[in-house]
């Protein structure tokens, strides 16, 4: 069932006759939804920018960013984004030195909410992943996601329908590669319908040189090398973004920060092995869900690996409903490749 709340969350309406629905969530990114409805007084009154779309079955929630009335087709099209994007309504206005990623991210969010309504932060999981990073400036979600990517930590904004609040959470999913609850997506086992396998190394880099400037009289330039690959398997990138040592940083701390920047860059520029499959709509959310690590096997193509479910896409149209999963890093489009490598 799809429910649409008004902007101030005081009222909601059920949407039961959508012409088409596309909803997608990602493990550590902003997802989106596109919903097409017939134009009638009920739907017109239900839709407003800033309202919340909630799928009660798949536990997905989105904030409406825009909508369009088309009188020729007699439709209204709603465009929405996953509610973690609400954090980008706030900027990081004070310098934050991060060591433990989970507690550091929590502190950055808490100290920058500044009255953002109906948003809470979930409890700590006890993750021990560490970093050497300084967050200052930029939008909150955009700035924390690279650190989460390096540590393979997901983020989501869970909708608490009883209290009508958004709860921001960090999570890692379950390891479902072994034991009685193991999950295997395999063409041979008939558990990988519409299988697409992709291997993309177009942006792959495993060694990064990060240039920075010391805070001394001569403004000495330094370069920190991150990565240990050698020979033909070494793929290098030069990263110069005017990184400067802060007044309160020692040179050792600055070098550690540059190293962390290099690690985050390597985490983005990966060799992308991807399984894309269609699944039984009844299995998602019970047998496995976003963030879980599962096995992917294709004897015919010689592929066997453990992959995280990084994206889920639900589609409803005239042909019926289906769910597609992306396991592993999604393959880039040409535009995505340009954005990633700069």
Say what each PLM segment does.
Residues 26, 35, 80, 94-120, ...:
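Amphipathic, non-transmembrane alpha-helical segments in extracytoplasmic/periplasmic proteins
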Residues 1-7, 168, 207-212, 294:
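Short polybasic amphipathic segments
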Residues 17-43, 189-342:
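An acidic/polar, Gly/Ser/Thr-rich interaction patch typically located in mid-to-C-terminal regions
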Residues 41-121:
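Surface-exposed cap/loop segments at beta↔alpha junctions
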Residues 68-87, 123-205:
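Short beta-strand-centered interaction patches in the first periplasmic/extracellular domains
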Residues 88-94, 179-183, 322, 336-340:
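Short, charged, solvent-exposed linker or helix-capping segments at domain edges/interfaces
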Residues 1-16, 178:
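Polar/acidic, low-complexity leader/linker segments enriched in S/T/G and N/D
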């Amino acid at each position: 069932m799809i429910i649409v709340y008004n902007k101030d969350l005081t009222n909601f309406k059920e949407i039961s006759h959508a012409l088409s629905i596309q909803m997608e969530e990602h493990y550590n990114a902003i997802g989106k939804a596109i919903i097409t409805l017939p134009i009638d007084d009920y739907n017109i009154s239900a839709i407003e920018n800033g309202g919340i779309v909630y799928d009660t079955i798949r536990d997905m929630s989105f904030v409406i960013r825009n909508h369009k009335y088309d009188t020729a087709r007699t439709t209204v099209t709603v465009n929405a984004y996953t509610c973690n994007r609400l954090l980008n309504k706030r900027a990081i206005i004070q310098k934050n030195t991060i060591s433990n990623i989970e507690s550091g991210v929590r502190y950055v969010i808490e100290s920058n909410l500044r009255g953002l309504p109906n948003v809470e932060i979930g409890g700590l999981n006890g993750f021990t992943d560490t970093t050497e990073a300084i967050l200052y400036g930029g939008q909150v979600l955009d700035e924390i996601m690279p650190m989460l990517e390096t540590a393979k930590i997901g983020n989501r904004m869970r909708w608490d329908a009883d209290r009508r609040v958004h709860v921001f959470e960090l999570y890692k999913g379950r390891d479902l590669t072994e034991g009685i609850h193991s999950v295997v997506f395999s063409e041979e086992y008939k558990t990988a319908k519409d299988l697409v396998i992709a291997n993309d190394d177009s942006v792959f880099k495993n060694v990064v040189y990060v240039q920075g400037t010391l805070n001394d009289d001569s403004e000495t330039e330094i370069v920190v090398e991150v990565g240990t690959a050698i020979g033909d398997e070494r793929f290098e990138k030069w990263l110069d973004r005017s990184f400067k040592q802060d007044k309160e940083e020692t040179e050792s701390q600055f070098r550690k920060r540059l190293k962390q920047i290099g690690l985050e860059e390597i985490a983005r520029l990966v060799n992308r092995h991807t399984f894309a499959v269609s699944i039984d709509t009844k299995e998602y959310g019970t047998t496995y869900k976003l963030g879980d690590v599962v096995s992917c096997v294709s004897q015919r193509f010689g592929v066997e690996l453990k992959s995280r479910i990084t994206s889920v896409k639900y589609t409803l149209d005239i042909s019926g409903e289906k769910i597609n999963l992306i396991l592993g890093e999604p393959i880039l489009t040409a535009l995505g490749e340009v954005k990633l490598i700069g």
